[in-house]
Amino acid sequence: MIINTPEEMFKLGQELSKKYKILLLLGDLWAGKTLLTKWFANGLWIDENIVQSPTYAYINSYGWKLLHVDMYRIWEENDVWEKWINDQISKHEYIAIEWPKFIDSLDISHYAKITIEKDWDSRIVEISEN
């Protein structure tokens, strides 16, 4: 699908919040992964204005409702990380993971894999389910 406006991204985030508990978000820097997560959060009755990119923090938690993870700077899998992230996942109802890696070691099932590609002023969004 092609997203041409912020309103269309808002609508997509709202729809995803009604259908999925877990989002795996792929795309280049500034593609719109965090923006989509803001609108996903809004659909969960979380104020989208408090949702920020977890790039530097690695992980942002919005109560026990939403866990927002960025794996961009996670270079290798290890037992400590795996145990810690799975512990965090088990404590949250909804999960959004940017730059997902090591998916086989995460305790997740039935997720939407969302790829966002920049195309001038629009975004090309592909959604697949697992």
Show where each model-derived region lies.
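N-terminal pre-Walker A segment at the start of P-loop NTPase domains
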Residues: M1-L16
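Hydrophobic anchor at the beta1->P-loop junction of P-loop NTPases
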Residues: L25
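P-loop (Walker A) phosphate-binding loop of NTP-binding proteins
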Residues: D28
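Conserved lysine of the Walker
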Residues: K33
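Short beta-strand-centered segment that lines the nucleotide-binding/catalytic pocket of NTP-utilizing
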Residues: D47-Y62
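Switch II (G3) loop of P-loop NTPases
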Residues: H68-W75
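Short phosphate-coordinating micro-motif centered on Lys-Gly-acidic
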Residues: N78, N86-N130
